[in-house]
């Protein structure tokens, strides 16, 4: 289970260090677990970075990427999964007063990075 592995890894982190999780949680039940684990450890989730782009932009970029699993049907499934799983996840974090940093993913990679840094700084997360 991902949660068990994550708990083991987090236990080895120096307390003064920050941890960035990429791609976890992906479901509300995982988010609820993470919120509980953070609270139990006396920590907090300091911010969520949500990078968004219009579906047509994402579709075009994924098709250009050329990975074997980047087929239109598979990509459309990912869009449905986003609506079903990720949007409720963001709503859960918002109800728990976790800052959600909205980033425009349609920009260049360097502009996205700059916007993430600015958002984290504005949220009080030192990077």
Give the residues covered by each predicted segment.
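Glycine-rich phosphate-binding loop signature in dinucleotide/nucleotide-binding domains
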Residues: 10-17, 40-43, 123-126
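Conserved nucleotide-binding/hydrolysis micro-motifs of P-loop NTPases
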Residues: 25-29, 52-59, 108-110
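ATP-dependent small-molecule kinase phosphotransfer cores
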Residues: 1-36
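Small-molecule kinase domains that catalyze NTP-dependent phosphoryl transfer to phosphate-bearing small molecules
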Residues: 1-8, 69-115
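Amphipathic, charged alpha-helical segments and their helix-to-coil junctions
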Residues: 28-31, 104-126
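Alpha-helical structural signal in soluble globular domains
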Residues: 9, 33-41, 92, 115, ...
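Conserved beta-strand segments of the P-loop GTPase G domain that flank and frequently precede/overlap
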Residues: 22, 49-52, 102-104
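A glycine- and Lys/Arg-enriched "phosphate-lid" helix/loop adjacent to the NTP-binding pocket
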Residues: 18, 33-86
